[in-house]
Design a protein with these regions (language model features):
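Alpha/beta-hydrolase fold nucleophile elbow
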Residues: 162-174
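Conserved alpha/beta-hydrolase
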Residues: 118-137
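The serine-hydrolase catalytic nucleophile loop
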Residues: 103-117, 130
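Alpha/beta-hydrolase active-site loop
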Residues: 141-162
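A short loop-to-beta-strand scaffold at the N-terminal edge of the catalytic core in hydrolase folds
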Residues: 78-89
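Short beta-strand element of the alpha/beta-hydrolase
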Residues: 94-102
């Protein structure tokens, strides 16, 4: 009988450790804590060598964007979150690029350089802060699973807001690219002229494994814990 209790105790400890590790993996991969407002004199550019070459350009694009006239917009997601965006009008009735940023990014940081490109092409731009990022509500990032439903909601909003004849291009980078690609198998309205997807990932599993490697853990070992954490929490 004592052996049985020992075995049960060991199993319970192992189960608790698995749940704890899964929770920590969930926090690192999916959880997005409440975000303080960025000070008006600060530009949110990540640290790291990958950004140094482009830091000055990114800061200039962000400052130029802040100086541009815009209209703040918001929608309510399917699960009750307030999602926010900013609309930059090139001209009345111009085609609109509906733009989505990357993993743990912000519309200002990832997309500000794209607004000038839109204007050069005669397009307006609606920059979206994805759920769990910047000014939008939410504490969970789902690598496009929920975000692509938000994309469809923004698309419906744009058609209602700008008229049934508005022309729309869905644009995204990184996780935002995968977000817009995930809607490509839906019955999209004829308003959608096309999709611009820059460096999207091939699947949620692949990008999660990449995130695990960036955290310094073996992807094949960490992925089951991340997957379990997503299901539990």
């Amino acid at each position: 009988m004592q052996v049985v209790w020992i075995i049960l105790g060991v199993v319970m400890v192992l189960a608790l450790m698995i749940v704890l590790i899964s929770y920590l993996c969930f926090r690192m991969a999916f959880y997005s804590p409440d975000r303080p407002a960025i000070p008006s004199d600060a530009i949110d550019i990540p640290e790291g060598a990958a950004y140094e070459e482009f830091r000055e350009d990114m800061e200039k694009w962000a400052r130029d964007l802040r100086a541009m006239p815009h209209e703040e917009m918001s929608i309510t997601s399917f699960d009750g979150l307030t999602l926010r965006g900013k609309f930059y009008e090139y001209a009345p009735n111009a085609p609109i690029e509906l733009m989505f940023h990357g993993y743990r990014g912000t519309a200002e940081r990832d997309l500000s350089g794209g607004v000038a490109r839109c204007f050069q092409l005669g397009r307006s731009a609606l920059l979206v802060d994805q759920r769990g990022c910047s000014e939008s509500e939410g504490n969970v990032i789902s690598f496009g699973i929920n975000e692509h439903r938000d994309c469809l909601a923004w698309l419906d909003f744009a058609i209602q807001r700008f008229g049934k004849d508005v022309k729309i291009i869905l644009t995204g980078i990184s996780m935002g690219a995968s977000t817009v690609l995930m809607v490509s198998d839906q019955a999209l309205p004829p308003n959608v002229l096309g999709i611009l997807a820059d460096c999207g990932f091939s699947s949620a599993k692949d990008i999660i494994k990449k995130v695990i490697r960036q955290m310094g853990f073996p992807a094949d070992v960490g992925y089951p814990f991340v997957k379990l954490g997503a299901r539990l929490f």
